[in-house]
Structures are given as C-alpha cells and as structure tokens.
C-alpha cells in the first residue's frame, strides 16, 4: 500500500510540475504576442502621422488621443525630434535623454526599463517607435503599458487564482508582481535569489543553477519549502518573457497546484 501511495504521489508531483512549466511557457508567448500587437498599433498610427507635413497637426493629435482611448495604452505621447513630448491628456514634457526616445530616433522599436509607481504599486513600460516622413525620422510615438496588469491578466484563470506571478530581470530584480498579499511579502526591487536562497530546495535544481537559467533565458522549475512543514511547499516555474531579457515566474503552493489530482489522493 505504501508503495502504491508513493507511486501515485510521484505521478501527481511530476504531472503538476509539467503542467506548471507548460502553462508559464504558454502565457509568456501570450504576453509577447500582446505586446507585439501594441507595437503594431503604434507603427500603424506612426505611419499615418508621418504623412502629415506638420507632426503636431490637429489630425495627428486626434490620432494620439484615439490611440490611448482604443487600446490598452494608459498614456500615449507624440514626441518631436528635439524630445518634446505631447501627451494625450494635454501634458507636455521633455524626454530628450530617455533611452527609449534616443533608440526610436535611430529607427528602432524600443521598450523602456520598468517605471515603478509609488501611487498604485504597479510597473509600467514605454513602447516607442519612430515616426517617418519620406524615409526621414521626424519624431517618435510612444505608449505606456501596465506590465503588472498584463502579468495578472495572464494567470487569472490558472489554478483558480491561487499563487502569484513575478516579472524579474535576469539579474534577479523583481520589477512586477501580483497576487494576494497572503501569498507573499515582496516588493519592487527585491532580489528573487536572495528571497529564496535560505529556503529548502526539494528539487534537483540549486539557486546557482536557477541563476544560470535566468542569465541564459532558459525555462525551469524549482520546488521549495518556505517553512518547517510540508504545507509551505511551493512550485516556482519560470521562463523567458521575450523582451528586455526579463523572466516571468509563477509561484503557487504545491497543494493548490495538485488540487486537480485530489480524487487520486482520496
């Protein structure tokens, strides 16, 4: 009987880990496709704006407002060649030294480093593309995108909302997270590796190997124990997000991940 129980438990553990790894990989691809769609929105509008003799024409400003109203961009900005940015809400700022603007003026579609908000504790990025007129770059078009909301949306229907997601740089800095506070005590800027280095690893992977996976953008999964008892066991699945060398992770109690196999346990 003990042998049978061991066999079933191993079966459940193996298949739960496979499901975790597969789900995180699929959601990473989904996230990248969503961002590519929004790059498509920007490029389409930028092409239209480039047809105007005046980059700040009334028609272009109307397109700017419409872009913000009809997409998931929270803010949009039309930027002149000198770095003066005109936002959909009427604000005017200078972004001449921002990396995303400088790269867009070189003809690249760019993604900014994460911008943390002290107001709503969420992380945003700027997507930016060049505006061309007769093959000459005359400005840039950008939109701010909430990656915390994106991360949350991706995993809303997985495992009955149990667990939480993280977006982490390859160096281990947490730049976005979601989920119920009861599941975690983390904040922006925390080091993913420091958080987990003193926890008990129940899988073959070591934290050193996880660091190597992050650096190389490889998929992986670890099983850890955060406390002294089995009830604290967690799976952490991770994969490359496909932008800015970031990784996306999903953390869930083992008991929740294995719920679908409860009929076998009983």
Regions found by a protein language model. Give the residues of each.
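Juxtamembrane extracytoplasmic/periplasmic/luminal helical "stalk" adjacent to the first N-terminal
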Residues: 1-55
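Short N-terminal helix-loop-first-beta-strand/juxtamembrane motif that initiates sensory/input modules
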Residues: 37-43, 65-85, 108-109, 156-182, ...
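Extracytoplasmic/periplasmic sensor domains and loops in membrane signaling proteins
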Residues: 61-63, 88-117, 182-225
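Extracytoplasmic/periplasmic ligand-binding sensor regions of membrane-associated signaling proteins
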Residues: 70-72, 81-157, 161-164, 169
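Short hydrophobic/aromatic beta-strand element in the GNAT-like acyltransferase core
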Residues: 75, 128, 235
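Short beta->alpha transition motifs characteristic of CBS
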Residues: 89-92, 145-147, 176-182, 254
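Short glycine-/small-residue motifs
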Residues: 140, 177, 247
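Extracellular/periplasmic juxtamembrane segments that couple receptor/chemosensory ectodomains to their
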Residues: 196-265
